[in-house]
Amino acid sequence: MGDKPTLVTLLTVAVSSPPPSSPLPLVSFTELLLPPPSVAAAAVAATATSEVGEKTAEQEVAAADPETGNERRENRENEGGETRTTGTTAVKRSHDGIPRQLAERLRLCRHMDPEQDYRLPAQDVVTSWIEALRDADRDNYGRCVRHAKIHRSASHLTAYESYLVSITEQYNTASNVTEKASYVQGCIFLSFPVIYNNTQGCGYKYDWSNVVTPKAAYAELFFLLCSTSESSVVLQPLITKGGLCSSMAVYDEETMRQSQAVQIGFLHTQLVMVPFVPHACPHYAVPFTTPGKPGCGGAPSGVAGLEEAAPFGRVSVTRHGATLLCRVDHLTWISKRVTTYGHKKITRYLAQFRGTMDDDEAALPGEDEAWIASKNVQYEFMGLIFTVNVDSLCVDAEQRQLLGTVATSFCHRVSDKITARNMPRAFSFYLLTSAQRGYDLRFSRNPSLFFSGDALNCPLLNEPNVFSLTVHAPYDIHFGVQPRQTVELDLRYVQITDRCFLVANLPHEDAFYTGLSVWRGGEPLKVTLWTRTRSIVIPQGTPIATLYQITEGDGNVYSYNHHTVFRQMHAAGTTTFFLGDMQLPADNFLTSPHP
């Protein structure tokens, strides 16, 4: 038996060998990098041995690849190193404190650096690309034009009518469909059975139900699924693509009285699917605030989360045209906590900073300017991922200072194992600045800390989904006390056009229900949740709601009961559609009046 090949030998042979003539099964680089358990155990044993064992490993490397072996020996002779002994195990370390075995592995995979997620093309390349697109627009005159999503104000039912008829027919031809659907005046109507379970004999008003509906495939086409006024069981409204849907069902008082003696039975709900096409989310920015001046949307003046008693970090700001590069040092982190289910849980970490421009002659951002920050930066501690970014910024023109805060985002869970000492001491971000008037949507704080979605990163994505944003749980949500919880986020916005956000459910979520409501400018974001059982816990960072852009109308969905149904009102020769007390804007909900 010969000597077993080492990991370095395997990698050397794999790199130097020519490609085989026959295809081989795909193997990830991680599988190549991580040795099997037997090899890993041998590596640990080799680390615990004396210098003789380590020289033997060097000889194996030199035998497999003399250049690699010579390079390793030269590095050891030149760099030296130190030996740290813990108990009976001697660990060889280089000057930078990294164990040599780990340093060797990092050297082999040195091309797998974390900077790959943050690299961008040079500004002159982007500028030249945009100019080339403009030249192409002139050549394309009279043909198609480049899409400007903010210009689209309304959708038309005629663009989808034949497709709606088609998916209705597909639904009716399914073998498991007992109640046929019908397409009438732009909407799909269907009846669906709901199982009433009263085996305990006490009766209840709220239940949970699954329904199967026609399904749409267009990226921009959704449905408002809700019950009509003729239903004895009211399915609470959903925004869905169709297919299998789960929602909370509410029984009216008459149905509850009639079903007291029934243990398990069937009731029917009359459903309507209203075609829904949201507006594409516009480009956003965050205005610079000034001391003593109210922020965007009526937010408190100054910097969000700023605490005078806490120490400030130091920021150094360098201007590169319209871009500000900010380097923050000496950060001191403060934990924000909330009491949930009798326990205080960490919701996020926050640190504040202040500083001046590197160049005394460089101009500070003005009150009429707004900013867009670089993407969230990922950090890892004990295998737990969390992200950090700038939260809010304030410009003090008198002191020529820039004040601000950085914070962890709600898009990831902040574990109790992470403490303030584990948080980064230094941080860096850049700001793209421009005039506020160039942005239709302006948030009071960095929305990347609260939401996720392609609409926040459109310039860097191919074929992004610009029709929705996802809201994440800011803390662990417990339903042990009551099945209904309302989550409030201190984030506001101002929108110049007559648009607002529709807060809706997550697609295909059956563990909890998110109440449909309208989030208007100047108000904090509120998300109301119901759960099926009181033992459910929604961890921090879990998606809890979806945001859609709609044309602003009158009213809102104030209650979630048997009155939350689809209805229409006729007045002065016009027909208006409502969901509960909320008027459905005709620009987004594509309905035609009944004849």
Curated annotation (Swiss-Prot):
Pfam families hit by this protein: DUF570
Subcellular location: Host cytoplasm; Host nucleus
Main location: host cell
Gene Ontology biological process terms in this record: symbiont-mediated suppression of host innate immune response
InterPro entries, per the entry: Herpes_U10 (IPR007578)
Keywords: Glycoprotein, Host cytoplasm, Host nucleus, Host-virus interaction, Inhibition of host innate immune response by virus, Signal, Viral immunoevasion
Residues making up the signal peptide according to the UniProt record: 1-23
Signal among keywords: yes
Basic and acidic residues: bias regions: 69-82
Keyword Manganese applies: no
Glycosylation sites: N176, N197
Family membership: Belongs to the herpesviridae U10 family.
Reported function: Plays a role in the inhibition of host innate immune system by targeting host CGAS and promoting dissociation of DNA from CGAS, thereby inhibiting the enzymatic activity of CGAS.
Official protein name in the record: Protein UL31
Organism of derivation: Human cytomegalovirus (strain AD169) (HHV-5)
Gene: UL31
